[in-house]
Amino acid sequence: MKAFFSINAGLITLAMFSAAQENIPDAAPIADGPLVANPELDTLDMADMLYKQAQAPATKENRQEYGRLLDLSLRKYLEFTQRFPQSAQAPLAEYRAAMCLEELGRKDEAHGLFLRLIQTGSPALVAASAYRLATDASSAGEIDKAIQYYQLVIRNAEQNDLKVDAQYRLGRLFLSSGNPESAATMFCAVMGNPEADAKFVLVSRMGYAALCA
């Protein structure tokens, strides 16, 4: 009897499946047109893929492979800017090429691209490029340059986090260079920003407290 019910259940299931299959509409016809390559998009995608591979933690542990992938991505970004100079993505490719150069230790070449971008790029790229220049200038003890670049970041930053970051770092530079009033202005700007990251608010309070001590 159990076998009978099992067979019947199987037949019912098969019948239901067949009925369901009958209600599935035919697939839409597929056009036989050739696949169209997009050299502009393909070149940028390849450069981005290589750069992403270079940033993988396992890759960074292998300095030779890390450098090889960075060099390949750099070449692709530069190829993009040369082949498609009028592309809306050309400035972004140039910025990413500069990032590759920095990571490869070729800072002078990177700075050349960043300097060009702060003259020709969108506000977002101006801010990002100026931030890189400010960071390097600060590390090199070039305080006046770093201050100018951080001010450029603040004027152009579209991302609140980047602006807050630059304001805090600018406050520190003003503090270390003997300009307490400007330092206080920067720290207060961070503390008064309701969207500022809590860690920047905390260190800005500490900086402001140091001024009042």
Language-model region placement:
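Acidic, polar-rich low-complexity tracts and alpha-helical solenoid repeat scaffolds
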Residues: 17-213
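Sec-dependent N-terminal signal peptides of Gram-negative exported proteins
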Residues: 3-20
